[in-house]
């Protein structure tokens, strides 16, 4: 939760507090929250009724741990958010075609009860549809399908426009996806 107390901390302290955080929620006007990605899936949530937002970094590990659903639960607790009234944007990230994974990642999704016949595809190796996994999570949490906008932009395929750690290397740049309440 990004509250005014966090904003009053020295920058170095704020950096330590936020290190490794994959989701932020706030209802503080004028504060931009966001996540940096380079193939992982950025998700923005907006609750117009309670003027609250969330920014989520959904890598495969966070997706397996259901970070989108957990963030919605946090918004519900902190702000009284009704998931049915949320608006969601699933930003640019790696696509099913390009997200090749090992058996251990496939098994992690299977063990987390994801519908493997819908989200996975066997080519030479397994491929996982990370954007779809997160869209399913949003819907399972109560977000209406018509309130979810997926950009359907693959960072791996469009690495000239968007950063891709898989294609350009781990030291590639990062995409910052942010949201501010005015």
Language-model features and meaning:
Residues 1-182:
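Active-site microenvironment for binding and transforming phosphate-containing groups
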